């Protein structure tokens, strides 16, 4: 899988950064693209990338603030003409996302040529699709804001060839049945496939956060994640200023990384008061501390393998 950032600024765009938008490419598990938040100008950012809107099957909105949703109506309209015709779309988000989209479409007299399935979250959500499991949990941002825990399908354990030979089953087409079915038959006897396979392995886990100040659900979402995408609107200065505005400080994110055993962290939603030079200087200062965990400040169009 691969995470690509189309917007990394907080609140307002800058000359170097667009507002929030993240794409998750599901290959090799699926050929679909999932988007997380659609800030203003997202569709224009996507034009500079190989990703096509027609491959976007799901959009997950973290919360209803403008820097996370103002690009949604335009992107949905353009999808009709960029390979999305008659291809269903699932839109997941807080209560109000359906009304926002439908009112935007109605008032602008825009007509979509594909169906949208809306899923509005209350407190939490568990959603299954193509072997993926997505959990949404409520954060602390003053308005309903959610973090998404995306779990890729399990990988079936390796076949125990010796065990199969011991029951007289030599390598051949039957092995595929052992790998892909719960049971198989050999010489008139039914066997449990799991007895002839190694343990299944959980696929990669990606945690993608909306805006939040520290809260207990953060650890639920990010536990043992392979990749965590988290906001740090404030990357220097007093921590209490970030929390007063229901945002996270870089120190909050570092604490979460250690508590939740996160392998790699990608930090986005940086305040527009920081320019590229500021961010680079702060990064160099932070990584000189041996206690600093593994992280990156991301910029627009950065991509990371999961």
UniProtKB/Swiss-Prot annotation:
Residues that coordinate or bind Zn(2+) 2: 67-68, 211, 269
Keywords for the protein's UniProt record, in alphabetical order: Endonuclease, Hydrolase, Metal-binding, Nuclease, tRNA processing, Zinc
Keyword Cell cycle belongs to the record: no
Note on how the cofactor is bound: Binds 2 Zn(2+) ions.
Annotated catalytic residues: 67 (proton acceptor)
NCBIfam families the UniProt entry points to: PRK00055.1-3, RNase_Z
Family that this chain belongs to: Belongs to the RNase Z family.
Subunit structure: Homodimer.
Name of the protein: Ribonuclease Z
Organism of this sequence: Staphylococcus aureus (strain MSSA476)
């Amino acid at each position: 899988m691969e995470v690509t950032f189309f917007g990394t600024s907080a609140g307002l765009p800058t000359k170097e950064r667009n507002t929030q938008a993240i794409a998750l490419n599901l290959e090799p598990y699926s050929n679909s693209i999932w988007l997380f938040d659609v800030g203003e100008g997202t569709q224009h950012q996507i034009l500079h990338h190989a990703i096509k809107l027609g491959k976007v099957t799901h959009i997950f909105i973290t919360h209803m603030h403008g820097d996370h949703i103002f690009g949604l109506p335009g992107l949905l309209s353009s999808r009709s003409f960029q390979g999305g015709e008659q291809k269903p779309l699932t839109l997941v988000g807080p209560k109000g996302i359906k009304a926002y989209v439908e009112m935007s479409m109605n008032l602008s007299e825009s007509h979509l040529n594909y169906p949208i399935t809306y899923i509005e979250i209350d407190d939490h959500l568990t959603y299954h699709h193509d072997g993926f499991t997505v959990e949404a949990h409520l954060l602390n941002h003053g308005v309903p804001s959610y973090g998404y825990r995306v779990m890729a399908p399990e990988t079936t354990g390796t076949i125990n060839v010796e065990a199969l030979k011991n029951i007289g089953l030599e390598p051949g087409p039957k092995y595929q049945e052992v790998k892909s079915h719960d049971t198989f038959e050999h010489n008139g006897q039914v066997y449990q496939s799991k007895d002839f396979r190694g343990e299944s392995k959980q696929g990669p886990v990606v945690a993608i956060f909306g805006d939040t100040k520290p809260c207990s659900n953060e650890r639920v979402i990010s536990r043992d994640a392979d990749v965590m995408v988290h906001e740090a609107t404030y990357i220097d200065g007093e921590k209490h200023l970030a929390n007063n505005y229901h945002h996270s400080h870089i120190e909050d994110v570092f604490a979460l990384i250690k508590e939740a055993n996160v392998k790699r962290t990608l930090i986005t939603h940086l305040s527009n008061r920081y320019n590229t030079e500021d961010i680079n200087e702060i990064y160099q200062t932070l990584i000189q501390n041996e206690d600093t965990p593994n992280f990156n400040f991301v910029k627009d169009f950065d991509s990371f393998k999961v």
